[in-house]
Amino acid sequence: MRSFNKDEYLFREKLGYLVKGMVKARCFQLLVELSSIRSSRGIYALEDYFVKGRDLKEVCNEHDITPSYVTSLLRKLQEVNHKVIDILPYYRN
């Protein structure tokens, strides 16, 4: 059985969850465009986390934002990703 690190464990509940360092840059850009996230600090922090695979603490320090704020943004982006996955079957048929 695969063990999850702390970051992955938070977002493993649904099929298709975003994983730190595993999101393609273009996919990330599209998800941000679909989301309500507009803070440039927040967007750069999320990009460092999801695309570049940097640790949450490191990202918070570099972008001068709190871990709780980044976590709320992570959840928002995860929700957008899940909505995209949920709607995909309607476009495939």
Curated annotation (Swiss-Prot):
One of its GO terms (biological process) is regulation of DNA-templated transcription. The keyword Transcription applies. Transmembrane segments: none annotated. The keyword Transcription applies. It comes from the Bacteria. InterPro entries: Adhesin_operon_reg_prot, Fimbrial_Adhesin_Reg. Keywords: Fimbrium biogenesis, Plasmid, Transcription, Transcription regulation. Gene3D superfamilies: 1.10.10.2690. Trans-acting protein involved in the regulation of the biogenesis of K99 fimbriae (FanC). This is Regulatory protein FanA. It comes from Escherichia coli. The gene is fanA.
